């Protein structure tokens, strides 16, 4: 049996634009609660700091309007998507708004398959190896390890031993600029960043400062993990 068959339940063909964005900066900015009239300014602050992936959770005010505003404002190399996507029918609405990425707190196969049918990226939330491999079988591009605080770095290390290195492992939940290093050393490839990066009502200047702190923290952590 070849190594590919051991590592993948289905051929791995990740979304190319998403992988390019991850190569540039493997951190997903989560703008939970952002309003449509504020989205573009916060997106610009994130992009200027180096971020290339931004999601608007669907439990935000008028999320599809915010996705459309971000897509219109940001350069083509930025990936704009939706988070907290719970049902497959929402994927179509995300695409109509200009979204290119579906992020989920769970690993519903119908949602993952719908995203892949429509040609956009998908990062399902997984908390066990069983969920992780099922998500890959359905076509997941990225595995969102959630909640990271509960899973911890030992889970990252164990998963990395059995999940092909091409698949990004992205811890989400409780990530700060200071605690990325141990996750990277364990085998994580990126992060999803929530309230430590953005909270409703903060100014774009605050978003810019927090984004830069995360980018700096990422660079320091990456150097430490490479030693």
Model-derived segments and spans:
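Conserved N-terminal beta1-alpha1 strand-loop-helix module at the mouth
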Residues: 2-100, 107, 117, 177-178, ...
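Conserved anion-binding
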Residues: 77, 86-89, 95-182, 189-202, ...
